[in-house]
C-alpha cells in the first residue's frame, strides 16, 4: 500500500479480505501516515488483533516503536523510510518469506 498517508484506511477497507486470506501486505511507512496519532493506535491494534508482524526488506522483524523512531530521525525533507511487509505470524507465507 502506498496511498499517500491513507494506508490505515486501506487496511481498514480490506479487513474482510485480510480475515479470509491473511495476505502479505507491502506498505510504505511515512511521516504522513503517523501524523495522525490515531493511525499509530490503529496499526498497533491491527497487528495484535490479526496476529501480524512487521518485517523490513532484509527479512528482519521490526516493531512499531523502531519504525516510529526511524521516522522521527529522518531529515526534514525526507518523508518515508521505504517499504515494509506486514505478515501474519501463523501463515505459510511467513515460512517461505524467512527461508
Task: Describe the residue ranges of each PLM region.
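Conserved acidic-Pro-Pro-aromatic motif
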Residues: 1-99
